[in-house]
């Protein structure tokens, strides 16, 4: 089993996204040689589930994070490399839910997976 933890670290910035894409591509390419039976992602797929302002939603934020919809699209595309190749389980983390408080437990996970 391959365990991928906290992909948000790679997903949040467009310059680091190729690193995570290499991880999923490498896993798929080596499934037979390494007898990989499953992949587990321990959560925090994205840095921010949903960005609170319209400006940040489409332009990213002051910290260099990509817009939330772009983070979700990227992580879904990266995991799609495993579709039909290796079964995988994705756990959601706190970053995959509401933006600032536990009162908002909405997630966009179901929109992409």
In which residue ranges do the predicted regions lie?
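N-terminal active-site segment of His-dependent metallophosphoesterases
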Residues: 1-66
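Extended active-site neighborhood of metal-dependent phosphoesterases/phosphodiesterases
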Residues: 52-113
